[in-house]
Amino acid sequence: MPKEQYMCQLCANHGIFNQPKKGHKQKCPYRTCPCSLCALNTKRRALDQIERQLKHTNEPMTGQTATSMASPTPECPLSPTTPKMTPHTPTSGKDTFRNSISSSNMAFTVQLPATITKKELKLLRRDDTPLQNSLERPFPRSIDEAIETIKKEKMSSIFHSAEMLAVGESATSLI
């Protein structure tokens, strides 16, 4: 019976399934992919890691008590950002859930990747066109040309027809 193949979720987002497991995490071509699906997976992994850390800090230290009796060592905090928990007073009903959430608020700082929209991803992919296509695009040669192209593209205002009339009237009044 063949070994079960590893399914990388980042590759699966892009239609590639059954990647070989050994060394794939370091070699995954979508490891730093900015698309929204990959960003969601990365955020989910980060949140899972935070959840594991919370469970680990909330578990009683049963394994360490036996070793700490044999060799006394000074206690050191697990992390400088872990605040002390307030004592939990049991209540009934919906308040129990709210109190458990509010009493377990801990300060964890985790940098999550930015999620980009599909439109932004398409624009990024257009920018990754081959060099020949990018050379065909006209680039402004001066600041004035760049400003002119911006003004031309700016006609997406909802008042563009009124603005065009105002520009037309001012041009005819100058003549």
Swiss-Prot record:
Protein's recorded name: DM domain-containing protein mab-23
UniProtKB keywords: DNA-binding, Metal-binding, Nucleus, Zinc
Tissue expression profile of the protein: Expressed in a limited number of non-sex-specific tissues in males, including 6-8 unidentified neurons of the head, ventral body wall muscle, and the PHCL/R neurons.
Listed result of changing residue 38 to F: In e2518; defects in patterning of the dopaminergic neurons of the male-specific genital sensilla (simple sense organs) known as rays
GO MF entry, a single one: metal ion binding
Biased composition (Polar residues): 59-71
SMART domains the UniProt entry points to: DM
Protein localization: Nucleus
InterPro entries xrefs: DM_DNA-bd, DM_DNA-bd_sf
Species the sequence originates in: Caenorhabditis elegans
Main location: nucleus
Keyword Cytoplasm: no
A single GO BP: regulation of nematode male tail tip morphogenesis
Annotated region (Disordered), positions in chain: 58-93
One protein family per Pfam: DM
PROSITE patterns: DM_2
Top-level taxon: Eukaryota
